[in-house]
Each structure stands twice: as structure tokens, then as C-alpha cells.
Amino acid sequence: MAERKYFGTDGVRGKVGQFPITPDFALKLGWAAGKILATQGTKQVLIGKDTRISGYMLESALEAGLAAAGLSAAFVGPMPTPAIAYLTRTFRAEAGIVISASHNPYYDNGIKFFSSVGEKLPDEVEEAIEALLDQPMDCVESAQLGKAMRINDAAGRYIEFCKGTFPANASLKGYKIVVDCANGATYHIAPNVMRELGAEVIEIGTKPDGLNINEKCGATDIKALQKVVVESGADVGLAYDGDGDRIMMVDHLGNKVDGDQILFIIAREALRSGKLHGGVVGTLMSNMGLEVALKHLAIPFTRANVGDRYVLEQLKEKGWKLGGENSGHIIVLDKNTTGDGIIASLEVLAAMEAHKMSLNDLARAVPLFPQVLINVRFEGGKNPLESDAVKAVAADVEKRLAGKGRILLRKSGTEPLIRVMVECEDGALAQSCAEEIVEAVKSN
């Protein structure tokens, strides 16, 4: 695979107004993508976004670039990332474009693409788009220019799709659910899905103003949700991130239920109903408690690199259907082609309803190990993890933790940091082991 100049693992992302998140680059990106994609069928591309104010600017620039290449743009407005994957398939579009920076603050944004089947673009297509970005723009003949249209019923279509994944003979009637949409793309979707399935819904984070996305709300900051769940006597709280591809949950006591616990609940229910289709893919950061709990059920488990892209790659490689991260990216491949926060939350709610059990009871089956994370800054170019002294200390710690814990040492890809993670059933032992490794890293 050629080295990427513009595309990262999740499209193009950065600070608005700074390259590459500028209107002129978005125009060129729309044109380059259009030139590559225009060689195929419908010549229509879906464009969705989250609620950031910069989305207006970027969608207009992308649309102009696509039109110059002869492709038409269909705008769906603010919609969750997984909704664009679904709608791209159902509209039989050439591709879907999502304008979002996920859980980042409003001043960041990004652009990523889905293929016609709602999956990440193949590497060779991204590479072809990159190659064109360095070429001068041209424009098709006037009669071949693309058009723009707005799809007004996109939200309703996706709401119905989400509801259709919930068991037909089940209902959320009698449940009180607090839904936190991070002032992001799920603000007009998730509350309606839960209401139409019968739940009493309390909304927070559903008043986006273009600037308040992910601000003290949503999956990355659940304190407000925890407070409302406890004060209102709700059964459960759901927190989505800005683009709706991840989920965190809160039980009736205000306890956080993270991606590892959610993944286990879904896996166990799939096993019970005969729909698991293989094993579960986690990541290097998945808690060892998840691995142990799955082992007790004889469910195969493997770890991918951190990032939902790598989880998806492993799922496809193994032919499995379920994977995710502790950050709340949960992929249920027999429901959607990408991580989907609303679908994942409905899977857990269906398990609660089927067994008449609280989220607290379901999550208790995954006793998460205490996890100690320490970032160590280092000077100079040499990676301390290559030091024999650090390797010796790490090997000694691994020996002591054998069977009851693990360590993960990683060099940051963006900063001069070594990330030290130790987890163990014994929290005090995890802390002392982490400190021992940190001292070795600092000394080398």
C-alpha cells in the first residue's frame, strides 16, 4: 500500500480553517473523488454531517467539487455516521460522505467516505483519489455537470431501520430511558427510536447550536447523564458521541457500563439465541475481564489493534459478526456495516427486556479488572521500549502477572510519550507494577 499524504485511518481530519480542513481542499477532494467514482453506475453521492457549524461550509465545497466532476450530491443533513452507511446502500449511491470529527470539539472536523455497500473505501480507491488531488482541476461539459438535491425523509428511513433491528415481539413500554445525544448527529434520531418502541424518554444533549457538540455531554463525558439517571429514577441511560458511532451506558444506580461490558452482554445474548456466528473481536485495550468472561462461555476472543477499522478487518478475516472497543465502538455486522451506537444500545435493551433483568445485573457478569494507565514523556529520539533494561523489567512484571493480569506498552504515534498500561485483578499490584515499569522507562 502506498504511503498516504492526505487520508488517515479514518479519512481526512483536522482543525477547521487549517489544511486540510479548508473549503478549497474540500472542493478539490470532492472533485477528485467524483472523477474516480464517476466511472460507475448512478453518479450520485450521499452527503451527511454532524452538527458542527463548519459542516455547512464543507458540504457546499464538496458538492461543488462533485458537480464539476459530473456527480450529483444528495444532502441528508445532520445524520449519524452509521446512518450514512445504511442510506448509501439503500439509495444505491456511488458512495457516502460523512462530514464529522466524531467525539472531538466543534473546532475540528473531518471528511470520510463509504463505498456503495456502506463500507470503508478500498485502499486502491483512496490511493487513486489521493493521486488526483495533486493534479489541476478540470470541469466536465456543462450538460454533464452534477446537480444537488435534498433528501427530506432520511431521518425517518433510518429510524425505521433501527426499530427493525429490535425483536418484533418485544417493546420498551414501562422503561424510563435517559438519552444523551452529545448535541450531535443522533439528536433527532435516538430519542424517537426509543419513544416509538414504547419507552418514556428524557432527553439531554439534544439542542445542538453548531458549537456545543460533545461539550460536557455524550459518550466521552457521562457525568450529566449519570446525575439525571439517578435523580429521575430512570432504568438506564444511553450516551452517544457526536457522530453516533459509539455508545456508553449508565445503569439505574448511575454506574458506567463501558464498551467491553456492552460487547459481552451482546455476545452472551447472541450465544443464547444461536446467532453469535463465531467469536468476538476486541482490541489491545479491551479489559482482561472481558476476555475471562467470554472464556467462561467458551466464546473465542481475539484482539485487534486499537481502532474500529482494525476490529472490522479482523471480523472480515475470521468471518465473525461481533466486535468492538472499550470506548464504545460496537460493530454488529449482521445489523450494519460499521459501528452503530443506536443499534448496539438496542441490542442491550433487547437483552434486558428478554430476561427482565436490569443493566446492572447484566453487566455484573463482566468483572472488569482494575486498569492503571500512565503516560511517560521521554526526551531525544530513542524509543525507551527498545532498551534492554526496560524489556527486562517488563518481562519480570509479565511473569508475576501470569494468568491474573497483563501489561501493554506502546509508543504514541503523535507525541514523545510511552503509554504504560497494567491491569490485574489486584488493583494495588497493578499500580505497583505500573510504577515499576514507569521508573525503568524514565531511567532509559
From Swiss-Prot:
Name the positions where Mg(2+) binds. Answer: S102, D241, D243, D245
InterPro entries given in the database record: A-D-PHexomutase_a/b/a-I, A-D-PHexomutase_a/b/a-I/II/III, A-D-PHexomutase_a/b/a-II, A-D-PHexomutase_a/b/a-III, A-D-PHexomutase_C, A-D-PHexomutase_C_sf, A-D-PHexomutase_CS, Alpha-D-phosphohexomutase_SF
Q: Sites of the modification Phosphoserine?
A: S102
Its UniProt entry gives the catalysed reaction(s) as: alpha-D-glucosamine 1-phosphate = D-glucosamine 6-phosphate
Q: Can you list the GO cellular component terms from the UniProt entry?
A: cytosol
EC number per UniProt:
5.4.2.10
Q: How is the cofactor bound?
A: Binds 1 Mg(2+) ion per subunit.
Record keyword RNA-binding present: no
Q: Where is the active site?
A: S102
Got any disulfides in this one, which pairs? Answer: none
Provide the alphabetized UniProt keywords. Answer: Isomerase, Magnesium, Metal-binding, Phosphoprotein
Per its UniProt record, the required cofactor names are: Mg(2+)
Mod. after translation: Activated by phosphorylation.
Listed Pfam families:
PGM_PMM_I, PGM_PMM_II, PGM_PMM_III, PGM_PMM_IV
| Record bears the keyword Magnesium | yes
* HAMAP family, per database record: GlmM_B
PANTHER family associated with the record: PHOSPHOGLUCOMUTASE (ALPHA-D-GLUCOSE-1,6-BISPHOSPHATE-DEPENDENT) (PTHR42946:SF1), PHOSPHOHEXOSE MUTASE (PTHR42946)
What is stated as this protein's family in its record? Belongs to the phosphohexose mutase family.
Function recorded in the entry = Catalyzes the conversion of glucosamine-6-phosphate to glucosamine-1-phosphate.
Protein name as catalogued:
Phosphoglucosamine mutase
Give the organism the record lists: Actinobacillus pleuropneumoniae serotype 5b (strain L20)
